[in-house]
Amino acid sequence: MSPENDIRLEAGRKLFAGAVNFLKSAPALEFLPAPTAPEVAFAGRSNVGKSSLINALTNRNSLARASTTPGRTQELNFFDVGEPLQMRLVDMPGYGFAKAPKDVVKRWKWLINDYLRGRAVLRRSLILIDSRHGIKDVDRDLMKMLDDAAISYRVVLTKSDKIKAVELEKTVKAITEEMRKHPAAFPEIIATSSEKGTGIAELRAAVYDAII
């Protein structure tokens, strides 16, 4: 491991070693907090393990769960990181609309599209993909939205402990190849496990990289 990477990892650790607090939920653009800090958004299909990953990232047991009670699932949830404030995490509503009413789907797409295109402090979006299932068409739809909005994004694999190492390697290779076709995609994939702690230090460093 290089000295430069050691510095990144330590900076990422320090970033999340202090205060992390739920700020607010925003069901529409007029409810967004003032753009006073850089933001990194977490997006992913429903049940991809987003809340668990945010909790592992921030060293909290129920931080994300506190803002995702029933009725808030179609809102953007903001978390302040650091005192004084250094950045904000944005928990985007889970997508994958097989059982969702059409008006809910349309409202979600409007909110996300408007947020991505109009939020000057958004530094990067992290797209969470379940290691067991790989990229789905709904993920590709979001990637196209990010490409069109010229928002840098990076794929983060969740639940990497749930598949064999050889299968994980194949998944990482396949997704890396696909990411090369997307102009706004960061080419390197981060494989994580909220349960085992795998990849969490690198994910913290990646968030730090995005805001400096």
Swiss-Prot record:
GO cellular component: cytosol
Domain (EngB-type G) ranges: 36-212
Gene Ontology molecular function: GTP binding; metal ion binding
Cited InterPro entries: G_ENGB_dom (IPR030393), GTP-bd (IPR006073), GTP-bd_ribosome_bio_YsxC (IPR019987), P-loop_NTPase (IPR027417)
Residue numbers binding GTP: 44-51, 71-75, 91-94, 158-161, 192-194
Cofactor(s) needed: Mg(2+)
The entry's keywords: Cell cycle, Cell division, GTP-binding, Magnesium, Metal-binding, Nucleotide-binding, Septation
Signal sequence region: none
Binding site for Mg(2+): S51, T73
Annotated Pfam families: MMR_HSR1 (PF01926)
PANTHER family according to UniProt: ENGB-TYPE G DOMAIN-CONTAINING PROTEIN, MSS1/TRME-RELATED GTP-BINDING PROTEIN
Role played: Necessary for normal cell division and for the maintenance of normal septation.
Family: Belongs to the TRAFAC class TrmE-Era-EngA-EngB-Septin-like GTPase superfamily. EngB GTPase family.
Protein name, as recorded: GTP-binding protein EngB
Source organism (scientific name): Zymomonas mobilis subsp. mobilis (strain ATCC 31821 / ZM4 / CP4)
Taxonomic lineage from the root: Bacteria, Pseudomonadati, Pseudomonadota, Alphaproteobacteria, Sphingomonadales
